[in-house]
């Protein structure tokens, strides 16, 4: 099954703001949440899995990639304004795409994200709009 997740993401600190996406002291928490919602969800739900194994006592620990029939073909898209985001700190992944939108009004970015999903829905079996701090724990969520 091919699944497309799309999420809006804005981090633009402003003094005395009540919103976490506008609070500098929340930067680390927001960065960790974005990492879990992107790379974490990709690692948890794709057909690509990683094993971490020791080569023996006092030997190296290695990481190996495995492909399984479990999971889905998952792509995650982050829809974000340039200069007002934390996406530059995410590791590269072939199934993670960052789209730097030209939308100036940050409150309209969720609408742009939804539009992107609708414009690309024919290429996927399932599409989903997700916030930038949501982790999908259930391994059967997409089944």
Task: Describe the residue ranges of each PLM region.
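Short, well-structured alpha-helical interface segments that form or flank functional binding sites
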Residues: 37, 122, 139
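Conserved donor-nucleotide/metal-binding helix-loop-beta segment in metal-dependent transferases, i.e.
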Residues: 137-143
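A conserved hydrophobic helix/loop-capping motif in glycosyltransferases and polysaccharide synthases
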Residues: 4-27, 31
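Eukaryotic short linear interaction motifs
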Residues: 13-15, 85-86, 136-137
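Hydrophobic targeting segments
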Residues: 2-7, 39-42, 74-78
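Short, acidic, metal-binding catalytic loop of nucleotide-sugar glycosyltransferases
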Residues: 21-73
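Active-site-proximal specificity loops/subdomain of glycosyltransferases
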Residues: 55, 62, 72, 79-126, ...
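The conserved acidic donor/metal-binding loop of glycosyltransferases
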Residues: 131-135
